[in-house]
Amino acid sequence: MAADGLPVRVLPTLDPSEGHTFLEPSKRINEGDDVSEFLCSKAYVDIMTFLLQLNRSMFPAKLPDGRVQTWPLNTEAVGFSAPVRQLQQLLSKIEDLLDATPLMPGEWRYANGAFQVWHDKVKKATPSLLAECLPAEILHAPSSDPNGPTAEVELTEYFLGSWGSRERMDYGTGHELSFLTFLGAIWKLNGFPKNEPGVEERTIVLGVIEPYLELIRAVIKKYKLEPAGSHGVWGLDDHSFIPYIFGSAQLGPAISNSDLVPETGSLPDAVDPDGVTKANVVEKERKVNMYFSAIGFINDVKKGPFWEHSQMLYNISGVQAGWAKINKGMIKMYNAEVLSKFPVVQHFRFGSLFSWNRDPSAIPPPSRIHTSSGPETRPRQVPPSARQDPGPGTKAPWATASQSTPPPSTGTAAPWATSRAGREPPTTSRIPSALPDTSRLPPGPMAPTRAPWASSQPAGPAPTGDPNDITTKAPWAK
């Protein structure tokens, strides 16, 4: 739904006066082709709606007197509601469990086994944690079917999915997605107070999501968790994605309630995107900005030149059109690299709040490019000339054939480095040339609030090669 008179779509809430049947969440994404169905589902639309709603709230605000209000971390301009404070207490208790679970002695090939002990503690404590955090009318909202479960079964699924995989001892964007969905489920159950547009959303981001990310970083560092579904050097980040979305919004141009989310520009005094490559800038900005907070964590756990271990983020730091351009690109990339990737969404489960049912206005995906990472029921023919490849998404989207082969001697230089460049960062453009465009939010009557990457122009000519490989210009490219 759209907020009255505002260019923003808002995640709908349940009407308490109407019946609702809750469902035990179930796995629906079992093969690559199921991702296409997911991208047409009500769950997908609701996830993107909630993400865009939160994103908009983090842009600086134009005040009636002409001043600009920004939303840095730990700002006193944001007051937390009672539900947000309850969620903060929940996170604090999980942190206490972390402190009370020391590392196991010995050598571990992957993550330390104490992670599984901590994970078991969180699971055991979940019923009481949710009961203390959420009002009974939210947690135990009944189904209209007398034999149906309460809302607790759906809330528990998304909450437990937020803390990494006990079996694989890893953490990635799929777990981050589960926490976002947990908060979205509370929203749909009317668990957050009604307020002016953006007010409560802002408290959710600053008061719950950022503390959650900080807690997860502590878990990752303590137990040395593996990244789940990482693209390696070609990925954006080994573990997280949403801090780059909200953090770039924090530095975007100021907007009023009637403005559309901007696609270019920055705050007049915003730090330059190139600041991510400067350690002193990162240390300063990580205290006030979510984007730089995530960059700071990368610097904490990775060694070597930033451009070498985080090439995607290094490339993005060369964007000249401002933080709003980066924000738009991040949302597009989240859609393509998280929600459209089988390895990420295969573990997501669907109930009534985030439903597998098809959205009536869904537009079928134009390409199967995002499903190629998953198993298929029908074998696909591989051309005899095709060489073995590590898989979709592991190669930089802008890489050419000549770039795919690493330098023969050093082994540590950037893939595009030449013998003259040595170990120095490249001096050519760092802007990726293309990314998959998998936008799916429908146009129609709500065109002003559709996904920010959606184009009103007709599609261009089909690319050469595989007709299924539909790509568009990178969101931050000029």
From Swiss-Prot:
List, alphabetically, the Gene3D superfamilies matched. Answer: 1.20.120.1150
Is the keyword Protein transport assigned to this protein?
no
Q: Which GO terms describe its molecular function?
A: peptidyl-prolyl cis-trans isomerase activity; protein tyrosine phosphatase activator activity
The record lists its disulfide bonds as none
Pfam families xrefs: PTPA
- Give the signal peptide as a residue range, or say none if absent: none
Q: What is its main location?
A: cytoplasm
Q: Low complexity: which segments have biased composition?
A: 396-419
Q: Where does the protein end up?
A: Cytoplasm; Nucleus
Q: Which UniProt keywords apply?
A: Cytoplasm, Isomerase, Nucleus, Rotamase
**GO term, biological process aspect, one:** mitotic spindle organization
Catalyzes what?
[protein]-peptidylproline (omega=180) = [protein]-peptidylproline (omega=0)
Task: From the UniProt entry, list the residue stretches annotated as the region Disordered.
Answer: 359-478
Q: Does the keyword Cytoplasm apply?
A: yes
SUPFAM superfamilies the record matches: PTPA-like
A single Gene Ontology CC term: cytoplasm
EC number(s) recorded for this UniProt protein: 5.2.1.8
- Function, please? PPIases accelerate the folding of proteins. It catalyzes the cis-trans isomerization of proline imidic peptide bonds in oligopeptides. Acts as a regulatory subunit for PP2A-like phosphatases modulating their activity or substrate specificity, probably by inducing a conformational change in the catalytic subunit, a direct target of the PPIase. Can reactivate inactive phosphatase PP2A-phosphatase methylesterase complexes (PP2Ai) in presence of ATP and Mg(2+) by dissociating the inactive form from the complex.
Into which family does the record put it? Belongs to the PTPA-type PPIase family.
Write down what this protein is called: Serine/threonine-protein phosphatase 2A activator 1
